[in-house]
Amino acid sequence: MASTYDTLTPEAQKGEVEIQNYTINFGPQHPAAHGVLRMVMELDGEIVERVDPHVGLLHRGTEKLIEYKTYLQALPYFDRLDYCSPLGMEHSYVLAIEKLLQLEVPLRAQYLRVLFAELTRICNHMLNIGSHVMDVGAMTPNLWLFEIREDCLNFFERASGARMHAAWFRPGGVHQDVPLKLLTDIGDWLDTRLPRLFEDAVSLFADNRIFKQRNVDVGVVSKEDALAWGFSGPMIRAAGIPWDIRKSQPYDVYDRMDFEIPVGTKGDCYDRVMVRIEEVRQSARIMKQCLSEMPEGPIASLDRKVVPPKRGEMKRSMEALIHHFKLYTEGFHVPAGDVYVATESPKGEFGVYLVSDGSNKPYRCKIRPTAFSHLQAMDFMMKGHMLADTTAILSAIDVVFGECDR
């Protein structure tokens, strides 16, 4: 009877084993996929040779649904795009409507928008930094950063009544004013709790040897490649390009704010995390300026063709009640035209191309998601890396599929 050794091939008897290429599915049911992403990967052993991302598993036809709603009814759809930073999505949409209407927004409303847009940025980065650190093997920082995120959600709830899907930014301003106690609480939080929790959490991993080994020189993108792939937000800033729409094309009161644009040097995963960490500090700086400079005054435009009458007025005036009913059923008519508005959302440039035919509903609303252009570079960034590095690269992109798939 032949021994096991005799049945082996000559190559195997010499101790040489040929590693064959094979194809695997990463996701869509995978905790590190950050949503319903399916990546078809071709591997040579553990080295990634090709990545083919399959998107669209969360496609809900948002752009088409918006065409059947009035301008105000379409607003909550934007909260459900990037559901980790909903107010960042609303911002582009309301600015686009205001540009078509040539609507003047009161100064207090602009300050409130900037305040909560930056709170949204902090909220988003807590989720991304925490989950990124957990994806590469650390648990504690994620739990600490989620305490800050919980504080942010509580502030959203106190301002709008909803923790996530706020629908608080409205054409002409914001839905309702915030109580003074909320503003003082946010100020106290920025001075004490936020820096303490945040810096403690960052100190656990920023200079950690294992964290650096998992992120430094992983998924490197040069300045030229970042521009060629259409990167924006922390992705392009990590590559060393100081591009920020809040500085280059300021909207609301960003032109009055004093803040720095953090940039990286290598364009790797470590730089992307560090850029987001510094962005949190800069956001806190902007919020403090908003709190100290915010004037008294109306929180929505005085144009009654767009903004509904006040609740007290409706109790006294039949005309105000009819006016309110008309605004919330028929909606307001927007002059014919088209406009593209982009804002600096926490993940990058979020754009809305809005086409009006003069009716009360958008003729077309094209949404420019931030992560779509980042995902197209997956093959470019992951090629030649180990399979374990793919989770770090994907997490550092910061992708949410509600926004990507629309």
Swiss-Prot record:
Signal peptide: none
Primary subcellular site in the record, as a coarse category: membrane
Root EC class: translocase
InterPro entries membership: NADH_Q_OxRdtase_suD, NADH_UbQ_OxRdtase_49kDa_CS, NDH1_su_D/H, NiFe-Hase_large
GO cellular component: plasma membrane
Domain of life: Bacteria
Cell membrane recorded as keyword: yes
Keywords: Cell inner membrane, Cell membrane, Membrane, NAD, Quinone, Translocase, Transport, Ubiquinone
Keyword Transport recorded: yes
MF (Gene Ontology): NAD binding; NADH:ubiquinone reductase (non-electrogenic) activity; quinone binding
Subcellular location(s) of the protein: Cell inner membrane
Enzyme nomenclature, EC number: 7.1.1.-
Pfam family, one: Complex1_49kDa
The reaction(s) this protein catalyses: a quinone + NADH + 5 H(+)(in) = a quinol + NAD(+) + 4 H(+)(out)
UniProt topology in membrane: Peripheral membrane protein
Subunit structure: NDH-1 is composed of 14 different subunits. Subunits NuoB, C, D, E, F, and G constitute the peripheral sector of the complex.
Family: Belongs to the complex I 49 kDa subunit family.
Purpose of the protein: NDH-1 shuttles electrons from NADH, via FMN and iron-sulfur (Fe-S) centers, to quinones in the respiratory chain. The immediate electron acceptor for the enzyme in this species is believed to be ubiquinone. Couples the redox reaction to proton translocation (for every two electrons transferred, four hydrogen ions are translocated across the cytoplasmic membrane), and thus conserves the redox energy in a proton gradient.
UniProt-recorded name of the protein: NADH-quinone oxidoreductase subunit D
Gene: nuoD
